[in-house]
Amino acid sequence: MKEPLLDLHLCKGLGDTICSTPTLRKLFFAYGKKISVLTDHPYIFKNNQYVDIIFDTSETSRESLEEGYELLVSFAPNIENQYKLGLIHNLMDIRQFHASGLGFNLLPEECGVDFTPDEWEPIQNLPDKFVLIHPVQSWASRTWDGEKWKLLTRMLNDNGIAVVSIGKSSSEIGFHMVQKPVFDFPIKLGLNLMNQTTISQTWWLIQKSLSFVTMDSGLLHLAGSTDSQIIQLGSSINWRLRAPFRNGVQDYKYHYIDGDCKIACASDMRYGVREWNSIRGIPPLVGCLENKKEFLCHPSVSQVFNKINEIIK
């Protein structure tokens, strides 16, 4: 019998990789043994109790593993079989995306993600109490304007609330090449840690924060392994397909703030049909599928400020 290996070579995103951990955990209990992993992000699995051997895709080829392992490919976006049954990520819960590719689903109580950080390393001048923000750029539909992040920070500071910013510049290759630079700006009361933290330091900062503010992002899913207050800013993908599960539910210490537009166009199959004449098609998700001049699904600064005050008072 070949040893089981969770094959994530097609899974490129940080958040998508974190969302494989519920499937990994279920495989552990099914096989009754630790599961090896092939991944672009080995640091995600470094301290995971369910993992046997971690293979880095930059160092190990799939072909070299085929003889000794059963390769369980869990993340195969839109790859169809003879019955044209592919998976469409914008229409699916991102945790189920991994599980469904292997032929099963996860129950709500099984959907929590796993990440075990290294020990906390103190950060110089870190405030005792702070709101943590994640001001980075992604697809336009998932980017809150940089000026809004600055204004939110200023409003919090003016009310005596320290702010710490985290995030890393990156890029993503999918249907488009998307550059994801950070919004890097000084903070009067607090600390700018953009492009400075490890994944473990980031986890601890989220855990220690009064609240963590982010769009739909990789760090949203990392936050799902903490006990922090999470504020997710609205975007065009239905929040129920992305919001973290903790204690078997999605509303535990979780707050979704949307704007006036609540149709979640990126998760509506009608737009795929409109673009491709088939529900199998994925419309261009980077923009507004209603062709509005601005993203009305995004919240205002005052909405976010008021929610933070409500949480931390």
Show the residue positions of the predicted features.
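Catalytic machinery of carbohydrate-active enzymes
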Residues: 1-313
